[in-house]
Amino acid sequence: MGLHDGHRGAPVADLPQRAVGGTLVFLVIMGGIFYGGWLWAAVATAIGLGSLWEFYGLLDSKQRVSRWFGMGAGAILLGAATLKLEASAYLSVIVFIAFLVLFSEVIKRQVTGNSAALLNMGGTLAGLVYVTLPWAFMILLRSRESGKLFLLAIFLCTWSCDVAAYFTGKRFGRTLLS
């Protein structure tokens, strides 16, 4: 009957693939956390920018966002965290990107007569706040005295809850996961 036989608790065909992928991500993140420094900054930046790209892709299916302005600002925010810049640097980047997006929408309105300035700015800034800032703060957190311990606790708790939710939903969920 395909990959899933429809019974509760039935094995999932992609579970081995999920396990391998999850193990690789686990090793990369744990390696970054344990070694810290530039390695952790590189891991967090890569994951943060990849997540931001995906967020903008999901949002772009509903509304237009300034993906490249957002990605540039995300890279700057993550770089500021790597260099341990003051909080004013983060605020400056966010305000500047809001200005750039609004300015580009004003130009677009003048040229095409069509614009969704507030939706575009809101979506672009949402990606920075919801996706990029947490990764920037994790870069900063790792540089603190007990940062390694805090990050380990955050990731291990998140992963164990995620795995438990997956198997609970698989076994008892109303809509079976395939």
Put a short name on every predicted segment:
Residues 2-178:
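Membrane-embedded alpha-helical bundles of polytopic integral membrane proteins
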